[in-house]
Protein backbone atom coordinates (compact mmCIF):
# COMPACT_ATOMS: atom_id res chain seq x y z
CA UNK A 1 0.00 0.00 0.00
CA UNK A 2 1.32 3.43 -0.92
CA UNK A 3 1.60 6.60 1.17
CA UNK A 4 0.26 9.83 -0.36
CA UNK A 5 0.83 13.51 0.39
CA UNK A 6 -1.15 16.35 -1.20
CA UNK A 7 -0.17 19.92 -2.09
CA UNK A 8 3.49 19.06 -2.67
CA UNK A 9 5.64 21.14 -5.06
CA UNK A 10 8.20 19.44 -7.28
CA UNK A 11 11.45 21.35 -7.96
CA UNK A 12 10.01 24.74 -6.96
CA UNK A 13 7.24 24.53 -9.55
CA UNK A 14 4.27 26.89 -9.71
CA UNK A 15 1.72 24.12 -9.32
CA UNK A 16 1.26 21.64 -6.52
CA UNK A 17 0.52 17.97 -6.89
CA UNK A 18 0.24 14.62 -5.15
CA UNK A 19 3.38 12.82 -3.96
CA UNK A 20 3.31 9.05 -3.55
CA UNK A 21 5.72 6.61 -1.90
CA UNK A 22 5.39 3.00 -3.09
CA UNK A 23 7.55 -0.10 -3.00
CA UNK A 24 8.51 0.40 -6.65
CA UNK A 25 9.68 3.97 -6.11
CA UNK A 26 8.41 7.53 -5.92
CA UNK A 27 5.83 9.38 -7.99
CA UNK A 28 4.44 12.90 -8.33
CA UNK A 29 1.50 14.09 -10.39
CA UNK A 30 0.30 17.64 -10.78
CA UNK A 31 -3.15 18.48 -9.46
CA UNK A 32 -5.82 18.59 -12.15
CA UNK A 33 -7.95 21.17 -10.34
CA UNK A 34 -8.50 24.24 -12.48
CA UNK A 35 -8.22 22.39 -15.75
CA UNK A 36 -5.56 24.66 -17.22
CA UNK A 37 -3.63 23.58 -20.28
CA UNK A 38 -0.35 23.86 -18.39
CA UNK A 39 -1.59 21.44 -15.74
CA UNK A 40 -2.77 18.86 -18.23
CA UNK A 41 0.40 19.04 -20.31
CA UNK A 42 2.66 18.24 -17.33
CA UNK A 43 3.56 14.56 -17.31
CA UNK A 44 3.73 12.61 -14.04
CA UNK A 45 7.19 12.28 -12.52
CA UNK A 46 8.36 8.77 -11.66
CA UNK A 47 11.56 7.76 -9.87
CA UNK A 48 12.44 4.05 -9.58
CA UNK A 49 13.60 2.77 -6.23
CA UNK A 50 16.94 1.77 -7.77
CA UNK A 51 17.74 5.45 -8.43
CA UNK A 52 17.55 6.50 -4.77
CA UNK A 53 20.86 7.40 -3.16
CA UNK A 54 20.42 9.69 -0.11
CA UNK A 55 17.47 11.58 1.37
CA UNK A 56 17.58 14.79 3.44
CA UNK A 57 14.90 16.60 5.44
CA UNK A 58 15.11 20.35 6.07
CA UNK A 59 13.14 23.59 6.17
CA UNK A 60 11.91 24.72 2.76
CA UNK A 61 10.09 27.61 1.10
CA UNK A 62 6.57 26.28 1.68
CA UNK A 63 7.09 24.29 4.84
CA UNK A 64 9.50 21.36 5.00
CA UNK A 65 11.56 20.09 2.11
CA UNK A 66 12.53 16.57 1.09
CA UNK A 67 15.71 16.48 -1.01
CA UNK A 68 16.51 13.25 -2.84
CA UNK A 69 19.94 12.66 -4.34
CA UNK A 70 19.66 10.19 -7.20
CA UNK A 71 22.29 8.11 -8.91
CA UNK A 72 21.75 9.38 -12.45
CA UNK A 73 19.01 12.03 -12.37
CA UNK A 74 20.54 14.72 -10.18
CA UNK A 75 18.71 16.26 -7.24
CA UNK A 76 14.95 16.03 -6.73
CA UNK A 77 13.30 18.56 -4.40
CA UNK A 78 9.83 18.11 -2.91
CA UNK A 79 8.51 21.03 -0.86
CA UNK A 80 5.33 21.62 1.12
CA UNK A 81 5.43 18.96 3.85
CA UNK A 82 4.37 19.67 7.42
CA UNK A 83 6.55 18.98 10.42
CA UNK A 84 4.28 16.10 11.44
CA UNK A 85 5.05 14.26 8.17
CA UNK A 86 8.67 13.62 9.15
CA UNK A 87 8.16 10.45 11.20
CA UNK A 88 5.88 8.89 8.58
CA UNK A 89 8.33 9.64 5.76
CA UNK A 90 11.32 8.46 7.81
CA UNK A 91 9.69 5.12 8.62
CA UNK A 92 8.46 4.63 5.04
CA UNK A 93 11.90 5.16 3.47
CA UNK A 94 13.56 2.88 6.00
CA UNK A 95 10.97 0.13 5.61
CA UNK A 96 10.63 0.24 1.82
CA UNK A 97 14.12 1.23 0.61
CA UNK A 98 16.36 0.76 3.67
CA UNK A 99 17.42 4.42 3.43
CA UNK A 100 17.88 6.73 6.41
CA UNK A 101 16.33 10.21 6.16
CA UNK A 102 18.91 12.72 7.39
CA UNK A 103 17.77 15.89 9.14
CA UNK A 104 19.70 18.89 7.87
CA UNK A 105 19.77 22.35 9.42
CA UNK A 106 20.63 25.40 7.30
CA UNK A 107 22.67 28.40 8.37
CA UNK A 108 20.47 31.48 8.73
CA UNK A 109 23.14 34.05 9.62
CA UNK A 110 22.83 35.75 6.24
CA UNK A 111 26.58 36.10 5.73
CA UNK A 112 27.84 36.27 2.17
CA UNK A 113 31.06 34.32 2.67
CA UNK A 114 31.76 30.70 3.42
CA UNK A 115 33.12 27.51 1.86
CA UNK A 116 31.98 25.68 -1.24
CA UNK A 117 31.65 21.94 -1.56
CA UNK A 118 31.21 20.43 -5.01
CA UNK A 119 29.18 17.37 -4.13
CA UNK A 120 27.87 14.65 -6.41
CA UNK A 121 24.76 16.42 -7.70
CA UNK A 122 25.00 19.99 -6.41
CA UNK A 123 27.27 22.75 -5.22
CA UNK A 124 26.87 23.49 -1.51
CA UNK A 125 27.75 26.87 -0.01
CA UNK A 126 28.29 26.31 3.71
CA UNK A 127 29.07 28.43 6.77
CA UNK A 128 30.44 26.84 9.95
CA UNK A 129 29.58 23.41 8.64
CA UNK A 130 25.94 24.28 7.91
CA UNK A 131 24.71 24.75 4.33
CA UNK A 132 23.55 28.26 3.45
CA UNK A 133 22.23 27.32 0.01
CA UNK A 134 22.65 24.65 -2.65
CA UNK A 135 22.80 24.92 -6.43
CA UNK A 136 21.95 21.74 -8.37
CA UNK A 137 24.28 21.19 -11.31
CA UNK A 138 21.24 20.74 -13.55
CA UNK A 139 20.32 24.39 -12.91
CA UNK A 140 23.74 25.68 -14.07
CA UNK A 141 23.75 26.66 -17.71
CA UNK A 142 27.20 28.19 -18.00
CA UNK A 143 30.16 29.44 -15.99
CA UNK A 144 32.93 31.90 -16.84
CA UNK A 145 36.10 33.18 -15.24
CA UNK A 146 35.06 36.84 -15.32
CA UNK A 147 38.29 38.11 -13.72
CA UNK A 148 41.38 36.79 -11.98
CA UNK A 149 39.53 36.25 -8.70
CA UNK A 150 35.90 36.08 -9.82
CA UNK A 151 33.76 33.26 -11.21
CA UNK A 152 30.33 33.88 -12.71
CA UNK A 153 27.59 31.23 -12.83
CA UNK A 154 24.62 31.56 -15.19
CA UNK A 155 21.47 29.60 -14.42
CA UNK A 156 19.35 27.68 -16.87
CA UNK A 157 15.99 29.37 -17.40
CA UNK A 158 15.16 27.54 -20.63
CA UNK A 159 14.14 24.19 -19.19
CA UNK A 160 10.53 23.66 -20.18
CA UNK A 161 9.97 21.28 -17.27
CA UNK A 162 11.26 23.84 -14.78
CA UNK A 163 8.49 26.36 -14.07
CA UNK A 164 9.38 28.39 -10.98
CA UNK A 165 6.97 30.81 -9.36
CA UNK A 166 7.80 34.52 -9.23
CA UNK A 167 11.13 36.12 -10.05
CA UNK A 168 14.04 33.96 -11.11
CA UNK A 169 17.74 34.33 -10.32
CA UNK A 170 19.71 34.34 -13.57
CA UNK A 171 23.31 34.86 -12.46
CA UNK A 172 25.54 34.64 -9.39
CA UNK A 173 29.19 35.62 -8.92
CA UNK A 174 31.76 34.32 -6.46
CA UNK A 175 34.85 36.22 -5.35
CA UNK A 176 37.61 33.71 -4.62
CA UNK A 177 40.96 35.29 -3.64
CA UNK A 178 44.30 33.57 -3.28
CA UNK A 179 46.52 31.31 -5.35
CA UNK A 180 47.60 27.70 -5.21
CA UNK A 181 50.95 26.29 -6.26
CA UNK A 182 51.37 23.08 -8.18
CA UNK A 183 54.58 21.28 -9.06
CA UNK A 184 54.95 20.81 -12.79
CA UNK A 185 57.69 18.64 -14.25
CA UNK A 186 58.26 19.08 -17.94
CA UNK A 187 60.04 15.69 -18.01
CA UNK A 188 57.11 13.88 -16.39
CA UNK A 189 54.22 12.41 -18.31
CA UNK A 190 51.04 10.69 -17.27
CA UNK A 191 51.07 6.94 -17.58
CA UNK A 192 47.49 6.89 -18.78
CA UNK A 193 44.95 9.56 -19.52
CA UNK A 194 42.57 8.12 -16.97
CA UNK A 195 45.19 7.71 -14.25
CA UNK A 196 46.79 10.30 -12.00
CA UNK A 197 50.02 8.30 -11.79
CA UNK A 198 53.03 10.02 -13.34
CA UNK A 199 56.31 8.45 -14.45
CA UNK A 200 59.54 10.02 -15.70
CA UNK A 201 60.07 10.22 -19.42
CA UNK A 202 62.85 8.09 -20.81
CA UNK A 203 65.36 10.17 -22.65
CA UNK A 204 68.10 8.39 -24.62
CA UNK A 205 67.42 5.19 -22.74
CA UNK A 206 68.37 6.70 -19.37
CA UNK A 207 66.26 6.17 -16.28
CA UNK A 208 66.46 7.56 -12.79
CA UNK A 209 68.04 10.84 -13.80
CA UNK A 210 67.32 13.95 -11.77
CA UNK A 211 64.31 15.82 -13.00
CA UNK A 212 63.69 19.51 -12.55
CA UNK A 213 60.44 20.51 -10.90
CA UNK A 214 58.80 23.80 -11.91
CA UNK A 215 56.31 25.57 -9.70
CA UNK A 216 53.16 26.82 -11.40
CA UNK A 217 50.84 29.29 -9.72
CA UNK A 218 47.12 29.15 -10.37
CA UNK A 219 44.46 31.35 -8.86
CA UNK A 220 41.93 29.75 -6.56
CA UNK A 221 39.18 31.13 -8.78
CA UNK A 222 40.59 29.37 -11.83
CA UNK A 223 40.88 26.08 -9.94
CA UNK A 224 37.28 26.39 -8.73
CA UNK A 225 36.12 27.29 -12.25
CA UNK A 226 37.77 24.24 -13.81
CA UNK A 227 36.47 21.88 -11.12
CA UNK A 228 32.94 23.26 -11.41
CA UNK A 229 32.96 22.79 -15.18
CA UNK A 230 34.04 19.20 -14.74
CA UNK A 231 31.60 18.42 -11.94
CA UNK A 232 28.64 20.15 -13.51
CA UNK A 233 29.51 18.68 -16.91
CA UNK A 234 28.62 21.99 -18.52
CA UNK A 235 28.04 21.38 -22.19
CA UNK A 236 28.65 18.18 -24.04
CA UNK A 237 32.08 16.78 -24.67
CA UNK A 238 33.77 18.19 -27.78
CA UNK A 239 33.83 14.73 -29.35
CA UNK A 240 30.03 14.54 -29.20
CA UNK A 241 29.57 17.57 -31.45
CA UNK A 242 27.82 16.99 -34.76
CA UNK A 243 30.06 19.53 -36.45
CA UNK A 244 32.61 22.14 -35.33
CA UNK A 245 33.89 25.38 -36.85
CA UNK A 246 37.19 26.77 -35.65
CA UNK A 247 38.24 30.38 -35.04
CA UNK A 248 35.09 32.09 -36.33
CA UNK A 249 35.08 35.89 -36.04
CA UNK A 250 32.12 37.46 -34.22
CA UNK A 251 31.39 41.17 -34.35
CA UNK A 252 28.77 40.70 -31.60
CA UNK A 253 29.96 39.64 -29.04
CA UNK A 254 33.30 40.72 -30.44
CA UNK A 255 36.01 38.09 -30.58
CA UNK A 256 36.94 34.77 -32.12
CA UNK A 257 35.14 31.64 -31.00
CA UNK A 258 35.16 27.94 -31.75
CA UNK A 259 31.63 26.76 -32.54
CA UNK A 260 30.58 23.28 -31.42
CA UNK A 261 27.11 22.32 -32.62
CA UNK A 262 25.32 19.51 -30.78
CA UNK A 263 21.93 17.91 -31.27
CA UNK A 264 20.13 20.31 -28.94
CA UNK A 265 22.58 23.10 -28.19
CA UNK A 266 25.49 25.21 -29.43
CA UNK A 267 28.62 26.10 -27.48
CA UNK A 268 30.83 29.08 -28.28
CA UNK A 269 34.32 28.71 -26.84
CA UNK A 270 36.44 31.86 -26.71
CA UNK A 271 39.71 32.72 -25.03
CA UNK A 272 37.99 34.49 -22.14
CA UNK A 273 34.28 33.65 -22.26
CA UNK A 274 32.16 30.69 -23.20
CA UNK A 275 28.51 30.76 -24.15
CA UNK A 276 25.89 28.08 -24.47
CA UNK A 277 22.54 28.40 -26.20
CA UNK A 278 19.78 25.95 -26.95
CA UNK A 279 18.52 25.44 -30.49
CA UNK A 280 15.07 26.62 -29.43
CA UNK A 281 16.56 30.02 -28.49
CA UNK A 282 17.35 30.75 -32.15
CA UNK A 283 14.37 32.66 -33.55
CA UNK A 284 15.80 33.82 -36.91
CA UNK A 285 18.76 33.10 -39.15
CA UNK A 286 19.70 35.94 -41.49
CA UNK A 287 22.39 35.61 -44.18
CA UNK A 288 23.47 38.92 -45.73
CA UNK A 289 26.38 40.05 -47.92
CA UNK A 290 28.36 42.93 -46.48
CA UNK A 291 28.48 46.15 -48.48
CA UNK A 292 32.27 46.00 -48.82
CA UNK A 293 31.84 43.02 -51.19
CA UNK A 294 34.55 41.17 -49.25
CA UNK A 295 32.75 39.70 -46.24
CA UNK A 296 29.50 37.87 -45.58
CA UNK A 297 27.42 38.20 -42.40
CA UNK A 298 25.38 35.55 -40.63
CA UNK A 299 23.05 36.87 -37.92
CA UNK A 300 21.30 34.75 -35.27
CA UNK A 301 18.37 36.32 -33.40
CA UNK A 302 18.36 34.89 -29.85
CA UNK A 303 15.42 34.90 -27.43
CA UNK A 304 16.03 35.09 -24.54
CA UNK A 305 19.36 36.76 -25.30
CA UNK A 306 22.76 35.61 -24.16
CA UNK A 307 24.06 37.34 -21.06
CA UNK A 308 27.48 38.46 -19.93
CA UNK A 309 27.12 40.35 -16.68
CA UNK A 310 24.78 43.27 -17.27
CA UNK A 311 25.25 43.03 -21.05
CA UNK A 312 22.72 41.14 -23.16
CA UNK A 313 23.21 39.91 -26.70
CA UNK A 314 19.87 39.46 -28.53
CA UNK A 315 21.77 39.07 -31.82
CA UNK A 316 24.91 37.11 -32.66
CA UNK A 317 26.70 38.52 -35.71
CA UNK A 318 29.23 36.26 -37.45
CA UNK A 319 31.53 37.51 -40.20
CA UNK A 320 33.15 35.33 -42.87
CA UNK A 321 35.35 35.95 -45.85
CA UNK A 322 33.05 35.93 -48.85
CA UNK A 323 35.00 33.25 -50.72
CA UNK A 324 36.08 31.22 -47.67
CA UNK A 325 35.29 27.53 -48.16
CA UNK A 326 35.21 24.59 -45.81
CA UNK A 327 34.90 20.83 -46.05
CA UNK A 328 33.33 18.97 -43.13
CA UNK A 329 31.69 15.65 -42.42
CA UNK A 330 28.97 15.31 -39.82
CA UNK A 331 29.83 13.31 -36.72
CA UNK A 332 26.78 11.07 -36.93
CA UNK A 333 26.33 7.34 -37.13
CA UNK A 334 24.84 6.16 -40.41
CA UNK A 335 21.80 4.72 -38.68
CA UNK A 336 21.19 7.90 -36.69
CA UNK A 337 21.64 10.05 -39.79
CA UNK A 338 19.25 8.00 -41.91
CA UNK A 339 16.61 7.99 -39.19
CA UNK A 340 16.70 11.59 -37.94
CA UNK A 341 18.69 13.89 -40.22
CA UNK A 342 18.55 12.59 -43.77
CA UNK A 343 15.92 15.12 -44.88
CA UNK A 344 17.51 18.03 -42.97
CA UNK A 345 21.27 17.77 -43.35
CA UNK A 346 23.88 16.50 -45.74
CA UNK A 347 26.31 13.87 -44.58
CA UNK A 348 29.24 15.82 -46.03
CA UNK A 349 29.68 19.47 -47.01
CA UNK A 350 32.13 21.12 -49.37
CA UNK A 351 31.05 24.72 -49.97
CA UNK A 352 31.44 28.25 -48.69
CA UNK A 353 31.66 28.40 -44.91
CA UNK A 354 28.68 30.70 -44.35
CA UNK A 355 26.51 28.47 -46.55
CA UNK A 356 27.54 25.32 -44.69
CA UNK A 357 26.92 26.84 -41.26
CA UNK A 358 23.56 28.35 -42.21
CA UNK A 359 22.38 25.05 -43.73
CA UNK A 360 23.38 23.09 -40.60
CA UNK A 361 21.61 25.57 -38.32
CA UNK A 362 18.53 25.52 -40.52
CA UNK A 363 18.34 21.74 -40.34
CA UNK A 364 18.80 21.52 -36.57
CA UNK A 365 16.59 24.46 -35.55
CA UNK A 366 13.86 24.18 -38.22
CA UNK A 367 14.24 27.91 -38.92
CA UNK A 368 14.36 29.19 -42.47
CA UNK A 369 17.31 31.30 -43.58
CA UNK A 370 16.37 34.90 -44.44
CA UNK A 371 18.28 36.29 -47.43
CA UNK A 372 18.14 39.63 -49.33
CA UNK A 373 15.03 40.15 -51.42
CA UNK A 374 14.05 42.32 -54.37
CA UNK A 375 15.55 45.61 -53.26
CA UNK A 376 18.65 46.88 -55.07
CA UNK A 377 20.28 50.24 -54.47
CA UNK A 378 21.57 52.58 -57.16
CA UNK A 379 24.91 50.79 -56.97
CA UNK A 380 23.25 47.35 -57.23
CA UNK A 381 23.66 46.50 -53.54
CA UNK A 382 21.08 45.16 -51.13
CA UNK A 383 21.79 47.78 -48.45
CA UNK A 384 22.22 51.54 -48.11
CA UNK A 385 24.70 53.36 -45.92
CA UNK A 386 23.13 55.33 -43.07
CA UNK A 387 23.47 56.11 -39.38
CA UNK A 388 21.38 55.31 -36.33
CA UNK A 389 21.95 57.92 -33.64
CA UNK A 390 25.76 58.13 -33.39
CA UNK A 391 26.41 54.75 -35.02
CA UNK A 392 27.13 54.27 -38.69
CA UNK A 393 25.99 51.13 -40.43
CA UNK A 394 23.91 49.68 -43.25
CA UNK A 395 20.16 49.41 -43.63
CA UNK A 396 18.93 46.25 -45.39
CA UNK A 397 15.35 46.58 -46.72
CA UNK A 398 14.34 42.92 -46.77
CA UNK A 399 11.15 41.53 -48.24
CA UNK A 400 9.31 41.73 -44.91
CA UNK A 401 11.48 43.77 -42.54
CA UNK A 402 14.09 46.46 -42.02
CA UNK A 403 17.44 45.16 -40.81
CA UNK A 404 20.20 47.46 -39.52
CA UNK A 405 23.79 46.28 -39.01
CA UNK A 406 26.03 46.17 -37.22
CA UNK A 407 25.86 48.03 -33.90
CA UNK A 408 23.27 48.01 -32.63
CA UNK A 409 21.58 45.29 -34.64
CA UNK A 410 17.94 46.21 -35.29
CA UNK A 411 15.17 44.09 -36.77
CA UNK A 412 11.86 45.85 -37.58
CA UNK A 413 9.18 43.69 -39.28
CA UNK A 414 6.96 45.49 -41.77
CA UNK A 415 3.96 44.19 -39.82
CA UNK A 416 5.00 46.46 -36.93
CA UNK A 417 5.37 49.57 -39.13
CA UNK A 418 2.59 52.16 -39.16
CA UNK A 419 4.16 54.54 -41.68
CA UNK A 420 7.49 55.74 -43.06
CA UNK A 421 8.43 59.43 -43.13
CA UNK A 422 11.04 60.68 -45.58
CA UNK A 423 12.54 64.05 -44.71
CA UNK A 424 15.72 66.04 -45.34
CA UNK A 425 18.55 65.85 -42.84
CA UNK A 426 19.17 69.63 -42.91
CA UNK A 427 19.20 72.81 -44.93
CA UNK A 428 22.92 73.35 -45.53
CA UNK A 429 24.50 72.55 -48.87
CA UNK A 430 26.25 69.47 -47.48
CA UNK A 431 23.38 67.93 -45.56
CA UNK A 432 20.89 68.57 -48.35
CA UNK A 433 22.50 65.69 -50.22
CA UNK A 434 21.08 63.24 -47.68
CA UNK A 435 17.69 62.46 -46.19
CA UNK A 436 16.24 60.80 -43.11
CA UNK A 437 14.05 57.71 -43.01
CA UNK A 438 11.80 57.64 -39.96
CA UNK A 439 10.04 54.34 -39.27
CA UNK A 440 6.94 54.91 -37.12
CA UNK A 441 5.76 51.83 -35.23
CA UNK A 442 2.19 50.78 -34.56
CA UNK A 443 0.37 51.10 -31.23
CA UNK A 444 2.29 54.27 -30.28
CA UNK A 445 5.52 52.38 -29.72
CA UNK A 446 7.65 55.25 -30.91
CA UNK A 447 9.78 55.56 -34.01
CA UNK A 448 13.27 54.75 -35.29
CA UNK A 449 15.16 57.18 -37.52
CA UNK A 450 17.88 56.22 -39.98
CA UNK A 451 19.75 59.36 -41.02
CA UNK A 452 22.26 60.48 -43.64
CA UNK A 453 20.99 58.29 -46.48
CA UNK A 454 22.19 59.49 -49.88
CA UNK A 455 19.60 61.39 -51.93
CA UNK A 456 20.49 59.15 -54.86
CA UNK A 457 18.79 56.25 -53.07
CA UNK A 458 15.55 58.07 -52.26
CA UNK A 459 13.54 57.28 -55.38
CA UNK A 460 14.42 53.56 -55.48
CA UNK A 461 13.86 53.15 -51.76
CA UNK A 462 10.54 54.96 -51.88
CA UNK A 463 9.33 52.82 -54.77
CA UNK A 464 10.34 49.63 -52.95
CA UNK A 465 8.50 50.59 -49.76
CA UNK A 466 5.34 51.46 -51.68
CA UNK A 467 5.52 48.10 -53.45
CA UNK A 468 5.39 46.48 -49.98
CA UNK A 469 2.14 48.34 -49.25
CA UNK A 470 3.77 50.58 -46.68
CA UNK A 471 2.43 54.07 -46.14
CA UNK A 472 5.19 56.46 -47.24
CA UNK A 473 5.04 60.16 -46.42
CA UNK A 474 7.48 62.52 -48.17
CA UNK A 475 7.56 65.66 -46.06
CA UNK A 476 9.74 67.65 -48.49
CA UNK A 477 7.41 66.98 -51.39
CA UNK A 478 4.36 68.00 -49.39
CA UNK A 479 6.05 71.23 -48.29
CA UNK A 480 7.00 72.06 -51.87
CA UNK A 481 3.47 71.38 -53.09
CA UNK A 482 1.97 73.58 -50.40
CA UNK A 483 4.49 76.33 -51.18
CA UNK A 484 3.77 76.19 -54.90
CA UNK A 485 0.05 76.29 -54.23
CA UNK A 486 0.47 79.32 -51.98
CA UNK A 487 2.70 81.13 -54.48
CA UNK A 488 0.33 80.38 -57.33
CA UNK A 489 -2.68 81.83 -55.49
CA UNK A 490 -0.75 84.99 -54.50
CA UNK A 491 0.35 85.71 -58.07
CA UNK A 492 -3.24 85.38 -59.31
CA UNK A 493 -4.48 87.87 -56.72
CA UNK A 494 -1.75 90.37 -57.62
CA UNK A 495 -2.68 90.23 -61.31
CA UNK A 496 -6.30 90.94 -60.47
CA UNK A 497 -5.78 93.79 -57.98
CA UNK A 498 -2.85 95.65 -59.52
CA UNK A 499 -4.33 95.93 -63.00
CA UNK A 500 -1.92 97.92 -65.23
CA UNK A 501 0.32 99.02 -62.37
CA UNK A 502 3.04 96.84 -63.64
CA UNK A 503 3.23 98.54 -67.04
CA UNK A 504 6.21 100.73 -67.87
CA UNK A 505 4.23 103.38 -69.92
CA UNK A 506 4.12 106.82 -68.36
CA UNK A 507 0.79 108.52 -67.52
CA UNK A 508 -0.19 111.94 -66.32
CA UNK A 509 -1.05 112.24 -62.67
CA UNK A 510 -3.83 114.79 -62.44
CA UNK A 511 -3.35 115.29 -58.73
CA UNK A 512 0.21 116.44 -59.26
CA UNK A 513 0.68 120.29 -59.22
CA UNK A 514 3.78 122.23 -60.02
CA UNK A 515 5.12 124.14 -57.07
CA UNK A 516 5.04 127.99 -57.07
CA UNK A 517 8.11 130.21 -57.12
CA UNK A 518 7.81 130.89 -53.43
CA UNK A 519 7.85 127.17 -52.73
CA UNK A 520 10.92 126.87 -54.90
CA UNK A 521 12.65 129.63 -52.98
CA UNK A 522 11.83 127.92 -49.70
CA UNK A 523 13.30 124.69 -50.95
CA UNK A 524 16.38 126.52 -52.12
CA UNK A 525 16.79 128.11 -48.75
CA UNK A 526 16.60 124.72 -47.08
CA UNK A 527 19.02 122.87 -49.29
CA UNK A 528 21.24 125.67 -50.71
CA UNK A 529 23.82 126.89 -48.25
CA UNK A 530 24.35 130.03 -50.30
CA UNK A 531 20.70 130.96 -50.35
CA UNK A 532 20.65 132.91 -47.12
CA UNK A 533 23.89 134.56 -47.97
CA UNK A 534 22.66 135.72 -51.38
CA UNK A 535 19.55 137.28 -49.84
CA UNK A 536 21.62 139.18 -47.36
CA UNK A 537 23.98 140.39 -50.02
CA UNK A 538 21.08 141.32 -52.27
CA UNK A 539 20.12 144.35 -50.06
CA UNK A 540 21.30 147.99 -50.93
CA UNK A 541 24.45 149.39 -49.52
CA UNK A 542 22.53 152.37 -48.25
CA UNK A 543 20.66 150.41 -45.71
CA UNK A 544 23.88 149.04 -44.36
CA UNK A 545 25.40 151.32 -41.67
CA UNK A 546 28.80 152.61 -42.51
CA UNK A 547 31.68 151.76 -40.33
CA UNK A 548 33.04 154.63 -38.34
CA UNK A 549 36.63 155.41 -39.00
CA UNK A 550 39.04 154.65 -36.26
CA UNK A 551 40.30 157.72 -34.46
CA UNK A 552 43.84 157.58 -33.47
Swiss-Prot record:
Explain what the record says happens when changing residue 547 to M. In pob3-21; causes severe defects in rate of growth
Cellular compartment(s): Nucleus; Chromosome
Asked whether the UniProt record includes Zinc-finger among its keywords, one would answer no
Q: Which SMART domains match?
A: Rtt106
User: A Gene Ontology CC term for this entry?
Assistant: FACT complex
What family is this?
Belongs to the SSRP1 family.
Protein's name according to its UniProt entry? FACT complex subunit POB3
Record the organism. Answer: Saccharomyces cerevisiae (strain ATCC 204508 / S288c)
Amino acid sequence: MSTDFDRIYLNQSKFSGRFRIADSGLGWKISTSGGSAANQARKPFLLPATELSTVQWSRGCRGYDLKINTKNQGVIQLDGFSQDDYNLIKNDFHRRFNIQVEQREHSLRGWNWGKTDLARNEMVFALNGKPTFEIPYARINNTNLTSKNEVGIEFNIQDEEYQPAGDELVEMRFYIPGVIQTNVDENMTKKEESSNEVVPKKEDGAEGEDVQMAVEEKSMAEAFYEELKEKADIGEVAGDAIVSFQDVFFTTPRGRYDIDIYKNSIRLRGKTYEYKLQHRQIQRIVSLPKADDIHHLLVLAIEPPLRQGQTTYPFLVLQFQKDEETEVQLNLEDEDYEENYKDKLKKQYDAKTHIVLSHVLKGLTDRRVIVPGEYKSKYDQCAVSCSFKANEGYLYPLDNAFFFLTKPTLYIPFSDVSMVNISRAGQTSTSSRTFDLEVVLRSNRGSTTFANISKEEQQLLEQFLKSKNLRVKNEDREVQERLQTALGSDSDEEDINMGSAGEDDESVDEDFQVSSDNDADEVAEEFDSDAALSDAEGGSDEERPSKKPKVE
